[in-house]
A protein has these predicted regions:
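Catalytic domains of carbohydrate-active enzymes, especially glycoside hydrolases
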Residues: 1-21, 87-90
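Acidic/histidine-rich catalytic cores of soluble enzymes
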Residues: 4, 14-15, 111-241
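Active-site acidic/histidine proton-transfer and metal-coordination neighborhood
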Residues: 4-5, 40-159, 165-166, 264
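A structural motif
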Residues: 12, 54, 89, 215, ...
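Hydrophobic residues within beta-strands of alpha/beta enzymes
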Residues: 15-16, 57, 92, 218, ...
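Glycine-rich, proline-tolerant flexible connector loops at the mouths of alpha/beta enzymes
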Residues: 16-46, 98-102, 227
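Short acidic/histidine-rich active-site segments
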Residues: 251-258
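C-terminal helical cap(s) of enzyme catalytic domains, especially alpha/beta-barrels
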Residues: 263-279
Length: 279
């Protein structure tokens, strides 16, 4: 609940909320949240944002049925779209990972489910945006095809610099997970990152360029830093030039995954890299 305060102290201006952090979310103690509880949450977060002069940008939804799969109902999503509207956010972010290897079925399911959410969100002036976030959704060509076939103006993307891993290497994932728990190898010249767990990936620069056409937000992810403060996996100057060339002028969110660092220090290093690279 100190999100607005800490973000303000770190020099940020906008807030992207992780729905899983609140009641009814992925990490919340309560499995569900009532309509009354949702309104109270929105009022509380609005007050905190206002107190610190912050702008509410979007809510990232990580609970509910997989939108890349066949879904009976989308009820878990609707309260969070309502909440985003109450908080004057412009978007909710959803995922389209899918649960099998059937590309055709994933495409059909994704189009149908996104269309339904967009229909619900449109009267509330909320965009429904998709992040490249694993599985088929990390293949920019596949995701662009889905967005192209959702006939709603309030559909879009949230391109993430580092999320182009289509398939994980189970052994490497286990190794990195252990390092994550331990805090990583702090004396390493190149810190281990989640990028190392990937067995199949889409080219990140090509992917960002393709997804920026539909972008209503951007997630600047960092994996780790070298001695010069540059990301060890991502060429930030190249990536941000792609963002600039697209004509995008909205907020750029900071997401730090440098698990060998203190979280606040990683966020500060990410912000510094972002500002230094955006020239």
């Amino acid at each position: 609940m100190n999100f607005a305060k800490i973000s303000n102290e770190l020099g940020f201006q906008g807030l992207e909320y992780l729905q899983g952090s609140y009641a009814g979310g992925l990490f919340g103690r309560k499995k569900e949240i009532t309509l009354k509880g949702m309104k109270e949450l929105a009022m509380d977060l609005n007050k905190r944002a206002e107190d610190y002069g912050m702008e509410n940008i979007l809510i990232m939804i990580d609970i509910g049925p997989d939108l890349g799969s066949k879904v009976d109902n989308l009820d878990p999503y609707y309260p969070w779209i309502d909440c985003a509207s109450e908080m004057n956010c412009h978007s909710v972010r959803v995922n389209l990972r899918g649960s099998d290897d059937d590309l055709s079925q994933w495409t059909q399911n994704s189009i149908e489910n996104l269309s339904k959410l967009c229909e619900y969100a449109k009267p509330l002036n909320i965009n429904v945006i998709v992040e490249n976030h694993g599985g088929f959704s990390s293949n920019a060509d596949y995701l662009v095809n889905v967005i192209d076939n959702v006939n709603h103006e309030n559909v879009g993307t949230l391109p993430d610099f580092g999320n182009f891993c289509i398939k994980q290497d189970p052994k490497k994932s286990e190794e990195i997970s252990k390092l994550f728990i331990q805090g990583g190898k702090k004396d390493s010249t190149r810190p281990p990152t989640l990028y190392d767990t990937c067995a199949e990936r889409f080219d990140m620069y090509d992917g960002i360029e393709k997804l920026m056409k539909f972008a209503k937000g951007v997630s600047a992810k960092t994996h780790g830093f070298d001695s010069n403060g540059n990301d060890v996996d991502i060429d930030y100057k190249r990536m941000l030039q792609i963002v600039k060339n697209s004509g995008y002028s909205g907020f750029i969110g900071v997401e730090a995954q440098a698990f060998t660092m203190d979280p606040i220090e990683a966020i500060q290093a990410s912000k510094k890299l972002l500002l230094n690279s955006y020239s």
